[in-house]
Amino acid sequence: MALNEVVISDSTTLISLLNIERFELLFNFSTIIIISQAVYNEVCYQPHAKTTLDGYIADERVSVKVVKNNERLQQLLIRLDLGESESILLAKKENLPLIIDEKKGRGIAVELGVKTIGLIGILLIFKKKSLLSDNEIIEIVDALRNVDFRVSEALLKFLLE
């Protein structure tokens, strides 16, 4: 059973988990993952990612929503990319938690009152709920590092404590 019914996600976590073939981990965190059209476009630049993501969309486990281009979006685009901006606005509008890993985007989301979590935070919750062992976490973090997802030794140590 997932820990959340529905969450919004930015692209980094999705791309990283698709690249290490562990996307299904997210469904332990949330039953349904909503993404913006811009995030869908960012994730689907690789054919294998598009195929996998489209499968989850067909199964209604991932949903794509269009975010209106308005003044609020334009203001966010001054500081963030389109995917992050749309994700933040979608999370704010739907009053749902946002999975976002970029520090700058997370800070802006928090300023706007959006509850955020990153991939490492999700792994920490999985550890506390005994959904992942230390060895599984080390395996996942090593795989993430191999696809250029940055995890410091200090953060890994904290995750394993």
Task: Please tell me what each predicted stretch does.
Residues 107, 111-117:
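A short alpha->loop->secondary-structure connector
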Residues 41-43, 106-108, 123-125:
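Short gly/pro/ser/thr-enriched loop/turn and capping motifs at secondary-structure boundaries
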Residues 2-96, 103, 114, 141, ...:
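Active-site-proximal, substrate-binding regions of enzyme catalytic domains
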Residues 98, 112, 130-133:
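Short capping loops/turns at secondary-structure boundaries
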Residues 21, 83, 118-121, 130:
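Glycine-centered flexibility sites
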Residues 120-161:
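Hydrophobic alpha-helical interaction segments
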